[in-house]
Amino acid sequence: YMIAGNHDAWSGSSDPIKWIAKQQGALYKSSEARLELNFPCGRKVRVNARHDFAGSSIWNPAHGPMKAAMLGSRDHIYVAGHKHESAYSVLKDPQNGIAMHAIKVASYKVYDRYAKERGFRDNALSPCVVTVINPDLPETHPDMVKVFWEPEVAAEYLTWLRGRR
């Protein structure tokens, strides 16, 4: 899935994210998407992806997704971009015990004249994030969702995980 956000405002009349999604056959939404992934074992995992979540903190870049997790719809994964910063936090839903993952992903925008001109700090750990879901673990287990900042490492973990079955 791909969330566009405001990329069309920076790239002229068309949205490059929409073009990439079409080329890859990926789900494309303009600002948000909530997905429920259904696994053969019966596990259901909910993903809440937005260009950004309301709320910010100078101390915690993951504040917006964390706020949505604690006050919102109780999904398993909350992921947003917008400010091109990386952050991650795991929370436990006190009502039903599920582990909720709040993620901010930077981007592949390496050369950012706009950020440099305005003095924005480089808070990008990685240009991407990959979540690998182990549907065999209970939704209360924090490792049901594993977060990786390197796609190759995520692929190796997924291969290892599948080999255990």
Language-model features: locations:
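Core catalytic region of metal-dependent phosphoesterases/phosphodiesterases
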Residues: 1-30
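MPN/JAMM (Mov34/JAB) isopeptidase/deubiquitinase module and associated MPN-bearing subunits/adaptors
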Residues: 138-165
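Short acidic-hydrophobic surface loop/beta-edge motif
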Residues: 31-42, 89-96
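Residues that cap or initiate secondary-structure elements
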Residues: 8, 41-43, 137
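Conserved beta-sheet core of the metallophosphoesterase superfamily
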Residues: 46-47, 53-147
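General small-molecule cofactor/ligand-binding pocket signal
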Residues: 28-29, 36, 48-50, 103
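Extended low-complexity acidic/polar segments
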Residues: 22-30, 34-38, 71-78
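Short, structured patches in soluble enzyme cores that scaffold and shape functional sites
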Residues: 2-4, 39, 49-53
